[in-house]
């Protein structure tokens, strides 16, 4: 049985996540999702055309055949025909969450219908995000990426994993101080103490980028991989941080990959691949993510469930892998 397009359209309200590949602009991702939805909605069963009563000729009477009998008949209104009025659905407002630049990849949250309001609520909730960031030692470029114009080449034989982890510990300690400063809580209060002990201290206003946790997942010179949990960041800020880590190690470094593995309650596991950017998959993703977004709509998110553990440099030797959500 064919689905009724208006009924399907009414189900498209909520948040879902897609996986943005590298080298693709976020606007292209959003426009592709919108185009696919419109195409499939217009292919579904539409409302039938309105009917109007017309008096149509039913035959002739009289010897000369000029007298015509007209009978009332219901005929469709031609103005409602798709070839006259065009497709029923021409625009769907698809909103975007925290964006990824063209070189980055990973979790990209989108909203449809009242999901656009949830995007604003999600922004005001100040969720953290997880990234896997890869760097390469021995070179510095103008834009901090391996494709940028090279401005310096250095040696890196003196760098060890222990030296790298000491730098990461300094970064995390410095950012913890910034976190306390921007939390706008009375540092002598019991509330501030409890939040700090539980690792739930967060700035509830817009602040500079803050690194909540950072650790080394892999160290194979000249390449290394970091796991970073942060908030209020940009991808370029993370690339610059790789550059500064290289300088602190008396060398240089460029960023070769920035991949977001979690944005608030949304993880890679619940993100739709490019082959899944269709109506059915998006409907299913919205249903599955509804429970995760209930806390966002209430304005009181369960941070511990949504954000997961904070990585730290001291756990760097425990093993390698993706970010935990």
Curated annotation (Swiss-Prot):
Region (Disordered): 292-325
Enzyme Commission number: 5.4.99.-, 5.4.99.25
EC top class named in words: isomerase
Catalytic activities: a uridine in mRNA = a pseudouridine in mRNA; uridine(55) in tRNA = pseudouridine(55) in tRNA
Key words, A-Z: Isomerase, Mitochondrion, mRNA processing, Transit peptide, tRNA processing
Gene Ontology CC annotation, any one: mitochondrial matrix
Domain of life, source organism: Eukaryota
Localisation: Mitochondrion matrix
SUPFAM superfamilies referenced in this protein's UniProt entry, alphabetically: Pseudouridine synthase
One Pfam family it belongs to: TruB_N
GO biological process terms, semicolon-separated: mRNA processing; pseudouridine synthesis; tRNA processing
Record-linked InterPro entries: PsdUridine_synth_cat_dom_sf (IPR020103), PsdUridine_synth_N (IPR002501), Trub2 (IPR039048)
A GO molecular-function descriptor: pseudouridine synthase activity
Catalytic residues as annotated in Swiss-Prot or TrEMBL: 101
Principal subcellular localisation of the protein: mitochondrion
Record PANTHER family: PSEUDOURIDINE SYNTHASE-RELATED (PTHR13195), PSEUDOURIDYLATE SYNTHASE TRUB2, MITOCHONDRIAL (PTHR13195:SF0)
Family classification: Belongs to the pseudouridine synthase TruB family.
Protein function: Minor enzyme contributing to the isomerization of uridine to pseudouridine (pseudouridylation) of specific mitochondrial mRNAs (mt-mRNAs) such as COXI and COXIII mt-mRNAs, modulating the efficiency of mitochondrial protein synthesis without changes in transcript abundance or stability. Also catalyzes pseudouridylation of some tRNAs, including synthesis of pseudouridine(55) from uracil-55, in the psi GC loop of a subset of tRNAs.
UniProt name for this protein: Pseudouridylate synthase TRUB2, mitochondrial
Source organism of the structure: Xenopus tropicalis
């Amino acid at each position: 049985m064919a689905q009724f397009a208006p009924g399907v359209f009414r189900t498209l309200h909520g948040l879902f996540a897609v996986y943005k590949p590298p080298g693709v602009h976020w606007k292209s991702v959003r426009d592709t999702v919108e185009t696919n939805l419109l195409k499939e909605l217009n292919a579904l069963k539409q409302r039938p055309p309105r009917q109007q009563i017309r008096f149509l000729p039913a035959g002739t009477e009289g010897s000369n055949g000029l007298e015509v009998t007209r009978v009332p008949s219901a005929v469709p209104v031609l103005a409602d025909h798709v070839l006259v009025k065009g497709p029923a659905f021409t625009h769907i407002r698809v909103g975007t969450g925290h964006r990824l630049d063209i070189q980055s990849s990973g979790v990209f949250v989108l909203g449809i219908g009242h999901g656009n309001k949830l995007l604003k609520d999600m922004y005001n909730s100040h969720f953290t995000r997880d990234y896997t960031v890869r760097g390469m030692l021995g070179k510095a470029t103008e834009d901090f990426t391996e494709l940028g114009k090279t401005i310096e080449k250095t040696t890196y034989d003196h760098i060890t994993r222990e030296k790298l982890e000491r730098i990461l510990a300094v970064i995390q300690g410095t950012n913890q101080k910034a976190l306390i400063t921007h939390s706008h809580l009375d540092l002598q209060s019991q509330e501030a103490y409890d939040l700090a002990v539980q690792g739930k201290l967060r700035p509830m206003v817009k602040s500079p980028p803050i690194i909540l946790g950072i650790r080394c997942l892999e160290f194979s010179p000249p390449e290394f991989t970091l796991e970073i949990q942060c908030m209020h960041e940009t991808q370029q800020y993370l690339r610059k941080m790789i550059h500064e880590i290289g300088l602190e190690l008396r060398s240089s470094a460029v960023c070769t990959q920035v991949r977001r593995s979690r944005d608030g309650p949304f993880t890679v596991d619940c993100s739709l691949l490019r082959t899944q950017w269709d109506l059915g998959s998006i409907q299913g993703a919205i249903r599955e993510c509804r429970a995760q977004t209930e806390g966002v709509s209430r304005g009181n998110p369960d941070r511990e469930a949504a954000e997961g553990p904070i990585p730290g440099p001291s756990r760097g030797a425990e093993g390698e892998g993706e970010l935990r959500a």
